[in-house]
Regions:
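Short, P/G- and charge-enriched loop/turn segments at secondary-structure junctions
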Residues: 53-56, 154
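Acyl-donor (CoA/ACP) binding surface of acyl/acetyltransferases
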Residues: 1-33, 66-172
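Short loop/turn motifs at secondary-structure junctions and domain boundaries
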Residues: 57-62
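Conserved GNAT-fold acetyl-CoA-binding loop/helix
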Residues: 30-53, 65
Length: 172
């Protein structure tokens, strides 16, 4: 995995050493209006990040690509992630509510998508999110995602109250 630098932030490959700072970010209650729940403890998060440092599933079928988002003040403000299988990826992201509405989430997801297309040969992307999370729906729509078909919802096991959004990528 590469470090991805932009003028507004840096995406750093996530490692266990990020756990302490990210625990504070992920303890932001506003994030969980539409998400499940915060990490139960710093130790739990550190263990999770250690596992994710392998960058792949035990059977080798999936690549786990996780980046933390660092702004120029050196503060971590969230993460972007992709679970990659040949040709496609499931993406997810979380951003501290203190940084919502500034275009940083959009920029970070866009930078990750560019990396996935250029260096991991990803051609299609999908994201599962809560239907009521309009901020996230709009972010994905601005990046070219659209609502998936009912058949795709079933295939990706989207649950009641969730929406599946898809995007077909083209190389620039």
């Amino acid at each position: 995995m590469r470090v991805i630098e932009t003028a507004r932030f840096t995406l750093e490959p996530q490692i266990a050493a990020h756990a302490e700072e990210m625990f504070a970010v992920l303890s932001d209650p506003a994030i969980y209006e539409y998400e499940n729940q915060p990490p139960s403890s710093l130790e739990w998060l550190r263990t999770r990040y250690t596992k994710l440092e392998t960058r792949c599933s035990a059977d080798g079928r999936e690549q786990w690509l996780n980046w933390v988002i660092r702004v120029p003040t050196s503060e971590l403000i969230g993460y972007v992630q992709a679970t990659v299988r040949p040709g496609h990826a499931a993406i997810a992201y979380e951003l501290s509510s203190a940084h919502w509405g500034r275009g940083l989430g959009h920029g970070a997801v866009k930078a990750m998508i560019s990396e996935l297309v250029e260096h991991y040969k990803v051609r299609s992307l999908f994201a599962v999110l809560k239907r009521d999370n309009l901020r996230s729906v709009r972010l994905l729509e601005r990046l070219g995602f659209s609502l998936a078909s009912p058949e795709q919802h079933v295939a990706h096991k989207a649950e009641v109250g969730e929406v599946l959004m898809c995007h077909e990528c083209r190389r620039a």
